[in-house]
A protein has these predicted regions:
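A short acidic-Thr-Gly-centered motif at the start of a beta-strand
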Residues: 34-45, 116-118, 134, 294-297
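Short loop/turn motifs at secondary-structure junctions and domain boundaries
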Residues: 104-109, 238-239, 382-384
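Long C-terminal interaction/binding lobes of large macromolecular proteins
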Residues: 44, 57, 74, 86, ...
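Conserved catalytic alpha/beta cores of large enzymes that bind or transform nucleotide phosphates
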Residues: 86-112, 160-170, 198-212, 216-217, ...
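Short Gly/Pro-enriched turn/cap motifs at secondary-structure boundaries
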Residues: 24-27, 102-107, 303-306, 403
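Residue patterns forming the tRNA-binding/recognition surfaces of aminoacyl-tRNA synthetases
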Residues: 1-47, 54, 70, 140-263, ...
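Conserved active-site neighborhood of enzyme catalytic/cofactor-binding cores
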Residues: 113, 136-147, 153-167, 241-250, ...
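Catalytic alpha/beta core of large soluble enzyme barrels
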Residues: 69-168, 185
């Protein structure tokens, strides 16, 4: 996540627009404001929400917490306890992909509690819904059904009021009634605030600035940038990966394997069993070791690294296969011949499938930047040009894949 902004910079890169857009959406940079909503009748209880559309804040008619949000059990009324607890149990059986899928039916339940909109002091009901994820943003949202697709359908489903608070210029003389809407009014660039007290008539982007200023002056919020991107969880429960050089000691805790003992090598006699765990966990010769700190008994980490770790950098090492560990340049250990790297990199054109747009093609850009910051490369992008070669399709005109059963048996 530290490299998110730099990964959004495609300047001087000849990459397909579609891949650039996919990476931009994956990183998901959102500029907006984050502010607090106080819970009615709950002294000192509040929660934070983030919005990229502060100009629609007067249209908030409800707010939603993730089922896992820490406030849910505290603010839920006695009358709603059973239905809320049942909903939390049901949502816990769904994974994040299921919960956020566009095709997943949006469901939720009312907690019985209310929050106060700091811009107009109106009370809005607090719901929980599994399409809100606790680990993304604040784990809570302000819901503006008049100007958000998801909120609109949720409000119609549960008979929650809808307010129109921004319109397009051509709608100013005849502001739509919320009951006549077939969908939300989404246009941002030409939007003008209405039904918003003394903000009426304020156009975007001035509307963003004015509301953000008031929120800040009230002391309830501030400008903020959010990212959809999370840090990379690299551990995998598989045999054929790069070992993670960590040992666990009962006395000293978690310790890194000393540099002079690297690389940690995989055994060649592991036994594979249908346990769902890595064979390394049952290989005594690999598992048992000594603590580099105290010399006592210790165990190695048995998870290995994600395959994309290796494919993000090993092509640099391929340029100097006989380079030996310990060879140095300017008294610094270097894993490859820097002269060959300078002669041949960055790559002029990389040919790769678009299916890797948010995986390998993002990871190897990230790795190149990290290696440059470590002084191991003198450039920050791995390739100047990307060419997507397309897919081989089966007779059913779908991507040829084992999972689809449409491959040709050689």
């Amino acid at each position: 996540t530290k490299y998110a902004d730099e990964l959004l910079d495609f300047q001087n890169l000849d990459w397909p627009e579609r891949v650039r857009t996919m990476q931009e959406n994956w990183i998901g940079k959102s500029e907006g404001i984050e502010f607090s909503l106080k819970v009615s009748d709950q002294k000192n209880k509040s929660f934070r929400v983030f919005t990229t559309r502060p100009d629609t804040v007067f249209g908030m008619t409800f707010c939603v917490l993730a089922p896992e949000h820490e406030l849910v059990n505290i603010i839920t009324t006695n009358e709603q306890k059973n239905v809320v607890n049942d909903y939390i149990k049901a949502s816990s059986r769904k994974n994040e992909i299921e919960r956020t899928s566009e095709t997943h039916e949006k469901t939720g339940v009312f907690t019985g509690a209310y929050a106060i909109n700091p811009m107009n002091n109106e009370s809005v009901p607090i719901w929980i819904a599994d399409y809100v994820i606790a680990s993304y943003g604040t784990g809570a949202i302000m819901a503006v059904p008049g100007h958000d697709e998801r909120d609109f359908h949720f409000a119609r489903k549960y008979n929650i009021p809808i307010k129109v608070v921004v319109v397009n210029p051509e709608q100013l003389n005849s502001i739509p009634n919320s009951s006549d809407l077939n969908g939300p009014i989404l246009q941002k660039e030409t939007s003008i605030m209405v039904n918003s007290q003394n903000f009426d008539g304020t156009a975007w982007p001035e509307s963003f600035e004015r509301v953000a200023e008031i929120i800040s002056k009230k002391g309830v919020g501030e400008r903020k940038i959010n990212y959809r991107l999370h840090d990379w969880l690299i551990s995998r429960q598989r045999m054929w990966g790069t070992p993670i050089p960590i040992v666990y000691c009962g006395t000293c805790g978690m310790k890194p394997v000393p540099y002079e003992q690297l690389p940690v090598l995989l055994p060649d006699d592991a036994e594979f069993k249908p346990t769902g765990e890595s064979p390394l966990k049952f290989h005594e010769g690999f598992l048992k070791t000594t603590c580099p700190n105290c010399g006592g008994e210790a165990e190695r980490e048995t998870d290995t690294m994600d395959t994309f770790i290796c494919s993000s950098w090993y092509y640099y090492a391929y340029l100097s296969p006989y380079w030996k560990k310990g060879e140095t340049i300017a008294k610094k250990d270097i894993p490859w011949d820097m002269k060959k790297i300078k002669d041949l990199c960055p790559v002029d054109q990389y040919t790769g499938g678009i299916e890797h747009a948010t995986m390998h093609l993002l990871y190897f850009r990230f790795f190149t930047k990290v290696l440059a910051d470590l002084g191991l490369l003198d450039f920050r992008e791995p390739t100047k040009k990307l060419f997507n070669q397309g897919m081989i399709l089966g007779e059913d005109h779908e991507k040829m894949s084992k999972s689809r059963g449409n491959v040709i048996n050689p």
